Curated annotation (Swiss-Prot):
Lineage start: Eukaryota, Fungi, Dikarya, Ascomycota, Pezizomycotina
Family: Belongs to the chloroperoxidase family.
Induction line: Expression is positively regulated by the dothistromin-specific transcription factors aflR and aflJ. Dothistromin biosynthetic proteins are co-regulated, showing a high level of expression at ealy exponential phase with a subsequent decline in older cultures.
Involved pathway(s): Mycotoxin biosynthesis
Signal peptide start and end residues: 1-18
UniProt organism field: Dothistroma septosporum (strain NZE10 / CBS 128990)
Protein name (Swiss-Prot/TrEMBL): Dothistromin biosynthesis peroxidase dotB
Length: 414
């Protein structure tokens, strides 16, 4: 998670630009330069514990006609390798275990993501990684509606400014990979042939600016604001191969394409929805990636936004971005001047989510026991924030959100 002083992306070419050199392995000199520039300390290497199996029970299989796949490359790849059910419907316990087994996402952060995703797109006990599941897959009782899956969680879990997907209210499709956005990401690493946190952070900023310039309903609120920037960090560190040759983790075009279900090179790039794949001979992050990592990486990404407000949205026309006044909506507990200091950013975003949960879950129209799920979520957030000595936030002034037509209190899309 980071930010910027990037060039405004006014438009993307409709035809992918060919950069065949990007597909070639970096030279030894480039590799050493990459390692020198990589700020993250080498965390050690243990082949036996880090290798992720792609054989036997975890051999890649294309999804069947009735299998569900969605917008998240990590979830799709885990389903295609059988780390979560190949049908694309996972229980909370299954996904927490799988995220640790494949990506070494620690149970604290993995548990938070799971509980949040299950509440926003599932039945509170599990969820579809894509669209609505069949009734036979559901396990919860007391539901008042049909879960819509992770593909239908706009402004509740999924957000505008995805690094590879369109904004929902701009094109109506926030699930399928936009090859122009992906090509832009591929091209951005050309000078050194690798992808690091600066490359992904700068790409996130360009996507932010593209959304502002093209989506009149672009919105980036508190409850989803961490998603685009978290994605930048997760792709950088968790899609990288932490091998003996590069224990700090190196992410190249080959591995990036594998996780995003893209094949070919240059002008022959091809995206096949739902065919995401864990690369062979791939070693996961060496230690648990947890909330402390998320907080630190978010500051790295958000700092790239320089003086441009990172929260808020367009007010019904393109290029009408109006930022949220952090001090105003938090009663002065947080402010723009100190938001990137210490753990303030993480505390603000995670703590601020609590005040949106009742409406988001209720307006989802699925879970009957709203108070029970809210209690579970707030308890999880409280536990996560306990080590960070966060300032006490007593509420969020939601009236400030009324000017944003892209904000919908988490109501299902029509």
């Amino acid at each position: 998670m980071h930010f910027f002083s990037a060039i405004v992306l006014t438009c993307l070419a409709s035809t992918a630009v060919a950069y065949p050199a990007l597909e070639q392995a970096a030279s030894s000199a480039e590799f050493k330069e990459y390692q020198k520039q990589e700020k993250r300390q080498t965390l050690g290497f243990d082949a036996a514990s880090q290798i992720v199996s792609t054989t036997g029970d975890h051999a890649w299989q294309a999804p069947g006609a009735n299998d569900i796949r969605g917008p998240c490359p990590g979830l799709n790849s885990m389903a295609n390798h059988g780390y979560i059910p190949r049908n694309g419907y996972t229980s909370d316990a299954q996904i927490i275990a799988a995220m640790q087994a494949v990506f070494n996402i620690s149970p604290d952060f993995g548990g938070f993501l799971t509980v949040l995703g299950s509440a926003m797109g599932g039945d509170g006990l599990g969820f579809s990684i894509g669209g609505p599941p069949s009734a036979s897959l559901l396990t919860a009782t007391g539901l008042v509606g049909k879960p819509q899956g992770m593909s239908n969680t706009h402004n509740r879990f999924e957000s505008d400014q995805s690094i590879t997907r369109d904004d929902l209210y701009q094109t109506g499709n926030d699930v399928t990979l936009n090859m122009n956005f992906f090509q832009d990401l591929l091209n951005s690493s050309l000078p050194k042939g690798w992808y690091d946190i600066d490359v992904l952070g700068n790409h996130a900023v360009k996507r932010f600016q593209y959304s502002v310039a093209n989506n009149p309903y672009f919105f980036k609120g508190l409850n989803t604001a961490f998603i685009p920037e978290a994605t930048s960090a997760l792709v950088t560190y968790l899609f990288a191969n932490h091998s003996a040759a590069c224990p700090a983790g190196c992410l190249d075009a080959t591995n990036l394409k594998s996780f995003y279900s893209v094949t070919g090179s240059g002008s022959t790039l091809k995206y096949t929805p739902g065919h995401e794949r864990i690369p062979d001979n791939w070693y996961k992050y060496p230690v648990g990636y947890g909330v402390a990592n998320v907080f630190a990486d978010m500051v790295t990404v958000y700092s790239k936004y320089s003086n441009q407000a990172a929260f808020g949205g367009n007010t019904g026309t393109v290029n009408s971005f109006t930022g949220l006044d952090v001090a105003n909506i938090t009663g002065g507990v947080y402010n723009a001047e100190t938001l990137l200091q210490g753990n303030n950013l993480g505390c603000f975003l995670f703590n601020g989510m609590e005040f949106f949960m009742p409406d988001l879950i209720s307006n989802g129209g699925v879970i009957g026991d709203v108070s029970g799920v809210v209690s579970s979520l707030t308890g999880t957030i409280t536990s996560l924030l306990a080590p960070f000595n966060c300032p006490k936030l007593s509420g969020i002034d939601k009236k400030a959100f009324a000017i944003y037509p892209g904000w919908n209190d988490g109501k299902p899309r029509k």
